[in-house]
Amino acid sequence: MTPAELSELITETARTTLDAHGLDSSVVPESATVERPRNPEHGDYATNIAMQVAKKAGTNPREFGTWLAESLGAHEGIDEATVAGPGFINIRLAAAAQGKIVEDILTVGANFGHGDELAGAAINLEFVSANPTGPIHLGGTRWAAVGDSLGRVLNARGAKVTREYYFNDHGAQIDRFARSLVAAAKGEPTPEDGYGGDYIQDIASQIVEANPDWQKLGADEAQELFRSQGVELMFAHIKRTLAEFGTEFDVYFHENSLFESGAVEAAIQKIKDNGNLYEADGAWWLRSTNFGDDKDRVVIKSDGNAAYIAGDIAYVADKFDRGHNLCIYMLGADHHGYIARLRAAAAAMGYDPQQVEVLIGQLVNLVKDGKAVRMSKRAGTVITLDDLVEAIGVDAARYAMIRSSVDSSLDIDMDLWASKSNDNPVFYVQYAHARLCSLARKAEDLGVTREGADLSLLTHDREGDLIRTLGEFPAVVKTAAELREPHRVARYAESLAGTFHRFYDACQILPKPSDDEQTVAENKALFAARLSLAAASRQTLANALELLGVAAPERM
């Protein structure tokens, strides 16, 4: 019985118990909180539902708790239910009910941890969206890992997710990029407001090689040549880097297409027509304060050019018009002001601003030999995704980025994450998976199978710990999806790995070479049960790593 199944049983029993005593059962919530007690001697799980609903139902927590514990204790899957303190109910599962978790995992396999509570959600998940003016930096790397993992988690709980990259190929930064490339091609210094680094010279050299007569062009033509081909080459590099990092997108949306298609012009006209745009000081302003922003925003500047928010307005409308009912933006630490701005853009266009979510990721710092690493030879001024992968590998880079909440800044110790030690979280988790695979191979060599497993024999404390940890996985994934926090899956994987290692050290899973035939025969059902528990652990660990986009190696 998983915690989710136990929660359902508790709520059903609470309703029938209140009905039986002539009390109001409508006060029982849809789900009951089920937690592991701090002291294992108190039982496998505990719930505070009696304290939540007793007063509303017309009784006191202790009395209702006593009734409920008695009813729960009569259930075949529960060995014991007792009331403690002001009304806590401690529950100990029957051995067979605990073992059923193992059976369920082995039955559903790769789908263990999946659910359907987000069925019907069509989510546009936009992340990374780095400017095509340079390689992806550490902030973008964090979103490349976290965004991809979040997409996997949301999919696992039933949502249809479109992973989208907004390609900022319109605006002044592209002009500066083009001027930087032209300067590099001419052997001139980088413009004061331009972009430097080896990658600029590399791209400029590629354009020169492909266009040997470029110097015959006029200044404007040369600028346009380096602009268009430079953006194309940078875009190809970004896509290749992301693919090698294990991050794929369903849609690469070009900002410039919003202007070329007339979408920006149409959006501006729409908000003019609905009264959400007004003219002042020679410019046109969005009444964004009407929708919770701290100030109105310029949409058309006094020189007649569209401000950046004009593209945002057209873009959010395009997302909803494509059939999405939730738009999640994953933005950098310097984008806090965009939360109200993007919601105002949606509201001004007639969409529900509550269907716009903005996640803000904090800064990432690298540390090596105890010192901050700040420079990249490749990019000139910042550390890139390519630099990080070269130093510690894809799996370590992804795991390091995902395992902490994006609400806090992140320091990555490159020496730690490159090490092959249990102090390295990704090594620790992957080693547990490899150890489980090795165990399965050894069982096959010995002729030990899961056939005839009696899961009710799994009564050792370490077995119980492992089973309960396995049972938590669906709730962990569900919460990770609800809160947009895939780091919960990474922390769970570490907890599961540690719980498995303790089980492995405490319980004999396979026959020893010194065991005689009689001993092996007498323990056949137990060995099969423990091998089943190990197989369920391997499956769950593999499922967690899949949600993180991290490899689950069979050998290390």
Curated annotation (Swiss-Prot):
Subcellular location: Cytoplasm
An example molecular function term from Gene Ontology annotations: arginine-tRNA ligase activity
Motif 'HIGH' region: chain residues: 130-140
EC number: 6.1.1.19
Pfam families: Arg_tRNA_synt_N, DALR_1, tRNA-synt_1d
Cellular component aspect of the GO annotation: cytoplasm
Catalytic activity from the UniProt record: tRNA(Arg) + L-arginine + ATP = L-arginyl-tRNA(Arg) + AMP + diphosphate
Domain of life: Bacteria
Biological process annotations from GO: arginyl-tRNA aminoacylation
Keywords carried by this UniProt record: Aminoacyl-tRNA synthetase, ATP-binding, Cytoplasm, Ligase, Nucleotide-binding, Protein biosynthesis
Database matches in SMART domains: Arg_tRNA_synt_N, DALR_1
Keyword Transmembrane: no
InterPro entries in the cross-refs: aa-tRNA-synth_I_CS, Arg-tRNA-ligase, Arg-tRNA-synth_N, Arg-tRNA-synth_N_sf, ArgRS_core, DALR_anticod-bd, Rossmann-like_a/b/a_fold, tRNAsynth_Ia_anticodon-bd
Subunit note: Monomer.
Name assigned to this protein: Arginine--tRNA ligase
Organism (species): Corynebacterium jeikeium (strain K411)
